A protein has these predicted regions:
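Bacterial N-terminal signal peptides
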Residues: 8-18
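Glycoside hydrolase catalytic-domain context in secreted enzymes
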Residues: 19-381
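Positively charged n-region of N-terminal signal peptides that target proteins for export
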Residues: 1-6
Length: 381
């Protein structure tokens, strides 16, 4: 009983400090129990950066390579569970089973109602957590949404996934939806919203190697704006590059990923994932490099933290990164930086912490397609 009271009081203190403008510390409820943890990274009272550093220091190089793939294996000797990036959540999660379906993104944007859109994002985030409760290994909380591609051409077959041709409206609606997905807790993330597709992605024909030509003014005043809005407002915590090239360089290798997205907009606790089969596409589609070792090395250097390729089969990713290490194209330090970004997000989801500290761990399958969410869907339609 006293333990529960301490947790409640200390949790309230974290919320008060956050409201006062302080960076919320890790929930301090477990601080007096630090000796109970086998490793420091398991201690919720420590700052994220210290937990990440401790965890990385305990991984072998082989384990680090394995954790660079979308389907990250468990590391049983350290008590690290398996983790999967990527749950589609554009306007619901009905692809996982019976769930609430909200109007397509294009229709939602026409409401011009930030509050309503945030409510919808929150409902979808709840249902993501509900499916995660049913099967944590299959249903991850890293959501690949919202889509903030600007709708330049009505002939594009994916226009219904985006919000508008207007960068301001797209940025505001994306921020509202991602804020709902993220949740309102000062530390824990309900889900990890990941914006896509960066950058200038507006065609399906030859999308794997076509190049979008953009002058500097249009780049900064138009194409980058919706991404900047959602990321700088701390609504989104992830980014996915597009398949296409921009000015003849594959978007997955864009220098903007590091120089602009990570360093100027995002700050701490942010990661970049590739689109499916895009890493191997650097060689197979773009023909930009002649080996997967070179392609993966340059992708890591550009800012890619996690590789989505070959479905659940990590062999290509592991072989390419292992070869890149042997050839001196990347170092273990490069992998550490990428994994630090990924694990900073994983710690924010609460997967390493006691359930009583994370309010979103209480969301079960009861929230999926609930009457409350059905009414919200009806209102939004």
């Amino acid at each position: 009983m006293l333990k529960t009271v301490r947790i409640i009081i200390l949790g309230a203190m974290c919320t008060i400090l956050s409201a006062a403008g302080f960076d919320p510390p890790q929930p301090a409820a477990a601080k007096s129990q630090a000796d109970e943890y086998e490793y420091p990274f398991q201690d919720p009272s420590l700052p994220v950066q210290k937990r990440v550093s401790d965890l990385l220091s305990r991984l072998t190089l082989e384990e680090k390579v394995s954790l660079m793939h979308q389907y990250q294996p468990a590391v049983p000797r350290l008590g690290i569970p398996a983790f999967k990036t990527g749950t589609e959540a554009l306007h619901g999660v009905a692809w996982l089973g019976e769930a609430t379906v909200f109007p397509q993104a294009f229709g939602l944007a026409h409401t011009w109602d930030r509050y309503l859109i945030k409510q919808i994002g929150s409902a979808v985030g709840d249902e993501v957590r509900g499916f995660h409760h049913l099967d944590p290994a299959a249903n991850g909380v890293n959501v690949w949404a919202p889509v903030v591609d600007l709708l330049r051409d009505p002939r594009w077959g994916r226009n219904e996934e985006g919000y508008s041709e207007d960068p301001f409206l797209t940025g505001e609606i994306a921020t509202a939806y991602a804020s709902g997905l993220r949740g309102d807790h000062p530390f824990y993330l309900k889900t990890v919203p990941t914006l896509k597709h960066f950058l200038a992605y507006n065609n399906e024909t030859d999308r794997g190697f076509s190049s979008s030509s953009i002058d500097p003014r249009n780049m900064h005043e138009y194409y980058l704006k919706p991404f900047e809005t959602a990321i700088s407002k701390k609504a989104a915590y992830g980014l996915m590059p597009a398949y296409n090239s921009v000015n003849d360089k594959p978007a997955i290798l864009s220098p903007l990923l590091d120089s602009t997205v990570k360093r100027r907009w995002a700050g701490d606790d942010f990661f970049i994932v590739s689109d499916a089969f895009d890493p191997s596409g650097i060689v197979n589609d773009h023909k930009y490099y002649d080996s997967h070792e070179k392609a993966h090395a340059h992708a890591v250097k550009a800012g890619i933290d996690n590789f989505t390729d070959q479905g659940e089969n990590p062999e290509l990713t592991r072989n390419a990164l292992t070869g890149a290490l042997k050839q001196g194209l990347i170092s273990e330090k490069d992998l550490d930086q990428a994994l630090a970004n990924t694990f900073s997000i994983r710690f924010r989801t609460g997967e390493f912490d006691p359930d009583e500290l994370n309010p979103y761990s209480r969301l079960t399958d009861d929230v999926i397609n609930s009457p409350k969410h059905q009414l919200l869907a009806k209102k939004s339609g």
